[in-house]
From Swiss-Prot:
Keyword vocabulary terms for this entry: DNA-binding, Repressor, Transcription, Transcription regulation
UniProt gene name: ttgR
Any single GO CC term annotated in Swiss-Prot or TrEMBL for this entry: protein-DNA complex
The protein, known as: HTH-type transcriptional regulator TtgR
Function: Represses expression from the ttgABC operon promoter and its own expression. Binds to a promoter region between the divergently transcribed ttgR and ttgABC genes/operons; in the presence of chloramphenicol or tetracycline this binding no longer occurs and ttgR and ttgABC are derepressed. This suggests that TtgR binds these antibiotics.
């Protein structure tokens, strides 16, 4: 009985997340209410509050779902024991771009995060959440780059902090550009070239050296 109740709770949580995704994609995060999500999910607002305190937590759940399929590659590149951290980063980026193009749900969630998540005054929690997510990502990239330097895969004088900012900006900008104008960039056909462009920047740019 306890197991069944737990499974039902997990199913309800998944329903709510799916409904939030649909509502956010259609109306934007700021214009969507928890009542809208409850109606789409076929649950009460109380059921939503059982699982999520606010919209910020629902946005975080969508963000977390993007990381599930490639989290192991991120962790590997950040580990000092990984012998090929730059290779792990390359695989991760290939996976990120391929999923963006080929998986409809991944594309919708990215649309929400990049183009439908307005930072209005009453959305300060979501702004803070996104700031925290960017800083966490920066920390992970910096660790991966430092590991690649130690393994001789990147120049010894690479400024890992500055390079991490540049790499995030490159990837984030390419995703935003493709979402806005998908026909202007062959992200799938040229995926290896796009990834290697970013990695070549790390290897070759004098401006990223200390």
């Amino acid at each position: 009985m306890v197991r069944r109740t737990k499974e039902e709770a997990q199913e309800t949580r998944a329903q709510i997340i799916e409904a939030a995704e649909r509502a956010f994609y259609k109306r934007g995060v700021a214009r969507t209410t928890l009542a809208d999500i409850a109606e789409l999910a076929g649950v009460t607002r109380g059921a939503i509050y059982w699982h999520f305190n606010n919209k910020a937590e629902l946005v975080q759940a969508l963000l977390d779902s993007l990381h599930e399929t490639h989290d192991h590659l991120a962790r590997a590149s950040e580990s000092e024991d990984e012998v090929d951290p730059l290779g792990c980063m390359r695989k991760l980026l290939l996976q990120v771009f391929n999923e963006l193009v080929l998986d409809a749900r991944t594309r919708r969630i990215n649309e929400i995060l990049h183009h439908k998540c307005e930072f209005t005054d009453d959305m300060c929690e979501i702004r803070q959440q996104r700031q925290s997510a960017v800083l966490d990502c920066h920390k992970g990239i910096t660790l991966a780059l430092a590991n690649a330097v130690r393994r001789g895969q990147l120049p010894g004088e690479l400024d890992a902090e500055r390079a991490a900012v540049a790499m995030f900006a490159y990837v984030d900008g390419l995703i935003r550009r493709w979402l806005l104008l998908p026909d202007s960039v062959d992200l799938l056909g040229d995926v290896e070239k796009w990834v290697d462009t970013g990695l070549d920047m790390l290897r070759l740019s004098p401006a990223l050296r200390k």
